[in-house]
């Protein structure tokens, strides 16, 4: 890598409420200031008909892309389905009344996971219809998005609705046990934050699982920090992208007007982690085009793609070398570009 690694030190102690008690392990915090490949990308604009919301929900199952529809445009179905490549319209899938009871939909490999107050339902494409194939009862259905680790275990992030100060939790459906893993990057101080909820909101983060189930990545919204764990919850890597324009604070300010929103979302493949980085100053009304940061599962930065349009959701097909994006500001367009040559 051409950038500079500056070594800090993160003491990872699993002793907080709701977290599994483990031996203290010293993991260095590694700062990265550049990418081996830093590329300006011009994306193809593919018109979508019928027009969809396609703002936050872009789901790909095999060679089918599902984009969320608005209730005004279609009161019966949740998704419009298109064939890849080319975005040929196939039809509508997913009963709106069935999906309306859910709080969140997560993407799995050839599966969708619908979280609701009674648990979680697993959906797959059967022919050209989206069908529920199994259900999982949960202790508390108000979980954030869950991601499949293996046949029995699921990972979900620790947000302000959950107890404890762990990075994430592992839920085991075989015995309905929940185990907390990792700790927040900062210690809660009531002199800074009015309560734990405000602290956890400032350090809001998401999780993704490597498709083979061997790794978990945690990425933070208000700091360009990411952590990689093994599938038992042991921290393997603690990294932070440290560059200016705008800079990223190591510790998040309790003042929302000082916040910079960095990692919006992520997509995980067996080879790379793709982080959608907005770098948006929250006190500003302007929106810059985001960039996508590619990191391998050892924590090393690989590439940065500077996009020429604003997107809020994306999907990566490494086998076919394609990147797809959708935007809240352009609901009738899907953006695409080839990534294979850019990652060589």
Model-predicted segments: where are they?
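Surface-exposed loop and turn segments in beta-propeller and other repeat-based domains
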Residues: 33-49, 90-99, 134-140, 177-202, ...
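Repeated scaffold domains used in trafficking and secretory/extracellular systems
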Residues: 52-59, 98-109, 140-153, 204-207, ...
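Short coil/turn segments that connect the beta-strands within blades of beta-propeller domains
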Residues: 62-64, 109-110, 151-153, 212-214, ...
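Conserved blade-ending motifs and adjacent loop-strand segments that build the rim/top face
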Residues: 245-253, 297-318
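Beta-propeller blade signature
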Residues: 79-83, 168-173, 288-300, 338-341
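Loop/turn-rich, solvent-exposed surfaces of beta-rich toroidal or solenoidal domains
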Residues: 257-294
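Beta-strand-rich domains and repeat architectures in extracellular enzymes and scaffolds
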Residues: 45-77, 274-278
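C-terminal motif of bacterial Sec signal peptides marking the signal peptidase cleavage site
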Residues: 16-18
